[in-house]
Amino acid sequence: MACVSEAIGLALPYSAGTPAPYTQRDSYALKSGKAVMNLLAKNIRPRDIVTKKSLENAATIVAATGGSTNAALHLPALANEAGIKFDLMDVARIFKKTPYLADLKPGGKYVAKDMWLSLIHI
């Protein structure tokens, strides 16, 4: 689910998946605070950022990583709050067509930290 906040545009790239004990989290916290203040100064709100496309991206990330099926409920709920037409059938369609790319826990072999480490070394 950490990937979801990045996929919908509400977290800085690589920030949400950073493991808790890593010092990079401090840097992301500072950068995130600055980004939020910049967005507020420009009167940009979450509803200006979250779109149907970003929700589709989030569902795709969840499906590709074997992520939480709770996303099938949370993403449509978020869409509803934002006034975006995106429901469980949209999530199901995306889950059905998206290949499974990362064998992550809870059902898989690897933990989210492993994916984060692979991404920061690209």
Question: Which residue ranges define each predicted feature?
Answer:
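Conserved small/polar residues in nucleotide/adenosyl-binding loops
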Residues: 120-122
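Accessory "access/gating" subregions that flank catalytic or transport cores
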Residues: 3-107, 111, 117
